[in-house]
Amino acid sequence: MATDARLGVQKALKSRQKAIQADLAEEERLEAMLSYEKALYKEGYQAIAGIDEVGRGPLAGPVVAACVILPQHCKIKGLNDSKKIPKSKHETIYQAVKEKALAIGIGIIDNQLIDEVNIYEATKLAMLEAIKQLEGQLTQPDYLLIDAMTLDIAISQQSILKGDANSLSIAAASIVAKVTRDQMMANYDRIFPGYGFAKNAGYGTKEHLQGLKAYGITPIHRKSFEPVKSMCCDSTNP
């Protein structure tokens, strides 16, 4: 019995040590992701906004961008590039960002405008709209950290390659944009069943492509994206 007790204590200690090590590793990761922000604070900037988008590649639905200003030195456990966060944790981290953020703006550009101007320009428009949504909020950005994009706007900015994995502010924008768009696609799934929008978010999965063949194109499909584009041509040229 005494041996069993000692083993139990040893296991508990090892488990606690692992938890402490994991917490330290997470603290170091988050600290590293604040390197851009800390350098800008030293330069005198006060309100640094991270900007990112979600939805450039899907065959259906909008492109969504978010602009998020976090308090100085704010750390949110688990916050990372939204593609690296388990889907089961998206909502929890999204809510944590909403609670801690000083300001949040969201820009949504629908599939029709994407078809008109192309996805690259539509992404820029979504980002600019997200920034515009901050107007009227108490905190206004004096610097922008943008994921791999440069914007035509009179605010100091820096484009960061893989910014959502290297800047906590951009990562915050990434999860806000991701959850916002996923919620929209889940709603579209109820309106247009048979394409699996709630699961695939409009990307060209097997289920989505089968839905296109079985039911045709919906009003939210991007007609400038293949294979939707070819299907449009086929329907106009019987």
From Swiss-Prot:
Keyword Transcription in the entry? The reply is: no
Give the chief site where it resides: cytoplasm
- InterPro entries in the record, alphabetically? RNase_HII, RNase_HII/HIII, RNase_HII/HIII_dom, RNaseH-like_sf, RNaseH_sf
Per its UniProt record, the required cofactor names are: Mn(2+); Mg(2+)
Question: Biological process GO annotation list?
Answer: DNA replication, removal of RNA primer; mismatch repair
Major enzyme class: hydrolase
Can you name a GO cellular component term? ribonuclease H2 complex
E.C. code: 3.1.26.4
TM region(s), chain numbering: none
Q: Which domain of life is it from?
A: Bacteria
Quote the subcellular location field of this record: Cytoplasm
Q: How is the cofactor bound?
A: Manganese or magnesium. Binds 1 divalent metal ion per monomer in the absence of substrate. May bind a second metal ion after substrate binding.
UniProt GO MF annotations? manganese ion binding; RNA binding; RNA-DNA hybrid ribonuclease activity
Q: Name one Pfam family in it.
A: RNase_HII
Residues bound to a divalent metal cation are D52, E53, D147
Q: Which reaction does it catalyse?
A: Endonucleolytic cleavage to 5'-phosphomonoester
According to the entry, every stretch annotated as the RNase H type-2 domain falls at 46-237
As for family, the record states: Belongs to the RNase HII family.
> According to its UniProt entry, what is the function of this protein?
Endonuclease that specifically degrades the RNA of RNA-DNA hybrids.
Q: What is this protein called?
A: Ribonuclease HII
Q: Which gene does this sequence derive from?
A: rnhB
